[in-house]
Amino acid sequence: MSRGLWLLGLLYLLPAHSQTAVPKLRLPDAVQPVRYVVDLKLLPGEDPFEGRIDIEVDVRRPTSVIWIHANALEIQSVHFQSPSSTTAMNADAHENDLVGLRSPAPLPPGRGSIHISYRGQVSRILTDGLFQQRYNGDWYLFSKFEPVTARRAFPCFDEPSFKTPWRITLHVPEKLRAFSNAPMMSEEPESGGLKAVKFAESKPLPSYLVALAVGPFDVVDAGKAGRNGVPLRIIVPRGRAAEAASAAAQSPKIVEALERYFAVPFPYEKLDQVAVPLTTAWGAMENAGMIAYGSSLLLTPPQQDTEVRERDRVSVMAHEISHQWFGDLVTTAWWNDIWLNEAFASWLSSKMLMELRPDWKVNLDAAVSRNSAMNSDKLVSARTIRQPIEVPGDIANAFDGITYVKGSAVIRMFENYLGAGVFQRGVQLFLARHAWKNADANDFLAALNTAAGKDVGSLFSSFLNQGGTPLLHIDVSCGAKSAPVVHLRQERYLPLGSEGSTQSIWKIPVCLTRSAGTAAERQCVTVTRQSQDFVLEGSKECPSWVMSNQNGAGYYRTAYDGPWLAKLMRNGMPQLNTSEQLGILNDTSALFSGGLLNAADALGTSVRFAGDPDRHIVQATIGMIAAAAELTPPEYRPNLGRLIQSAYGARARSLGWSPKSGESGDDRLLRPALLPLVAISGADTALRDEGTRLATAWLDDRQAVDPDLVATALSIAAWNGDKVFFNRLVAELRRSKLQRERIQIVSGLKSFGDPALARSALELLFARDLEPRELTSLLTPSRKETRPVVWDFVKSHFDELNARLPGARGIPFAAQLPLTAAGFCTEQQRRDVESFFSGRMEKLKGGMRNLASTVENIRLCEKRTAALQPGIISFLKPY
């Protein structure tokens, strides 16, 4: 074509003679890519870029149109080359980034190549697609293509099922370094101060796993690992090599642990891990052979590193490196099965850390995550794990807590049910069957069935394909001469005020633990009906307690009928492991929220276990108290404060603001949760004043506060802070050169209670000398009192926020703004939210689901307050 065509996602009418319908969602399979050859000229610091792409294709059926994806690319010319001829093609742009490449006559079946020359723009705002950032005076260029933004870098078949080799050449300034998925083959000088960097042909990859990075990087050698001695490197912005020491030390251990589990060598020729100065809406990306991380996750100055930061870093690294097998070597066929990537990586991360660092007790963190997933899953508007993708916006919505956290919890349940060895054989079989190819849920379940020697897939599917959490009612009847019988009844757990139906049936693998003399015994059954009984094996004596969720691994809530909750609390709790105890406490909180347990029993349980030695148990009780605090009227806040002081005050003061030599990791992790609870809600003047003193000292001396407590101290100081302190925080925000410090300062800025200061903090989002992408958490206030301030700001600046702040995964930023109102609790507020967003969210991909969940949360809060507040008041009155 002689003129450029800007592909901006606008809808153009097809010529009247066209016989080919525009795809509604997925590309047709008449033409499939076989290989990509990409040639890009990338100049960090300059927005325009030039590209050529040759796509070798297999034309399976005669067609006059080849459908591909492109977004914001200027197509300059398109030709189709067959073994016998070369044909010029026209490019027609359609909605949803679809482009029809049209030939004058139908293309015959067989091999051919599409040759496209084009231009595009490198974004300075987004952190997906091709984007660039200036850091310490240098420009760096990166890519992040999952799920649907490879099409902003090159025209391509941008769906995960199209998995092919890629051969990439980059033309970049001669003084810069360039990286991609495959090893570099050569560098050749070119005119104009450029060089051509050629990379080896990659293994078969979908477009979303292709990766590029260009800039004045430093490279840290992390050694070699695994059976094949894979070279490992950490790629960092210039001058930050020392901050990669921990990541470099941990990488070989993680790779080798994963190789042992999978019984498959690391699949790629190298593993680079690249630090990106700033990311929004993502923390890391599992590009094959070249993982990208937000620098705050991967890098830390050695003198500021702590166990808390190391836990976060190693956990994310294990997640991303496990993707090299689960997601990259075997790739989901379509986005409805993204759980096969993300849920497995989340589960494997915990499993690997249990092997590498058993002292971290990440199995308990997994139990906490399971409860978090159930709290999200209580909504009728919640997605299913394997949610059908019906419109493009559903793709981005699939990357949520249901996919990651519920998915990993369900995997953990079936591993516990089948046994770790059987489950591992199923995983290994799945990888062996589908290496370098695509797979879906049915493929994984077939491998699991083979390994188990029985039908597991139908059980697993009942959790994949329907939303919600099972609620299992349990009772036991004991006869004088017969074995005890357990009575189970299942329904969907719903919170108070929900308009959903409880009539859901799962196929639940239930592993029950019961008393057996002074020990405990396990028995597993499969519950497939609404009501089901089974006999306790091996004993005719009535148990002194039963517990329905061995290891806390089951993805279900439990309600103990009759005397069995009291018996469990009195007789069973001392014999249970911490995961099981944690599950009972979390179920207690959920039953209270569901109106199935009174305030005295629920809050009394939290007080009883507030002094537990394990931080996870303590944090679970804090969660119950915090939920009650949301419903406590102002006149009873002093009572709540005295309860908090009596339950947690002594421990908070004992921990204090200064870590002690030789203290446990649990103490370090508990301190940031306990200190603000007691200092603020517990009205502990001494703790609050010390936190304020330390925060003020930190503004002058960054060594004055333990690194793990900086955000806590700044938030406490801001709680009753004045304009003078606010202005000091803003001044330091502008002065600081370290992203981690700026994030800590923002945690303070969102904690002011003065509405005028809260408003001033929000207005920083439009300050031209600040990075707005670092300030988005200001839209999720720490305080109930300032939620209306945020809401008014969102209503007044909706369009400006959408224009100023980057979206992610093809979803505009404004699609997330309904979530800023999720903490509201009255009918009037709900109506205001619905009225404001009506007509707005329908136009934004992904927006309607966020609005639905927010409206449902507000409605539930209305009902919960009316039903539970009297019981909470009654419980608090004696304090």
Residue ranges and their predicted role:
Residues 54-72, 167-173, 489-511:
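Surface-exposed beta-strand/loop patches in extracellular or lumenal glycoproteins
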Residues 17-50, 136-139, 160, 457:
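N-terminal, polar/Ser/Thr-rich
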Residues 72-135, 191-193, 531-541:
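A surface-exposed beta-strand-loop module
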Residues 75, 199, 227-499, 627, ...:
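Hydrophobic alpha-helical and helix-loop surface patches within well-folded domains
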Residues 25-28, 108, 117-167, 215-222, ...:
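Glycine/proline-rich low-complexity spacer/linker segments in large multi-domain proteins
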Residues 75-81, 456-457, 467-549:
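Beta-strand-rich binding/interaction modules
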Residues 370-371, 401, 487, 500, ...:
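Long, ordered, helix-rich scaffold segments
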Residues 51, 143-148, 155-318, 347-350, ...:
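Hydrophobic helix-coil surface modules that form long, contiguous segments used
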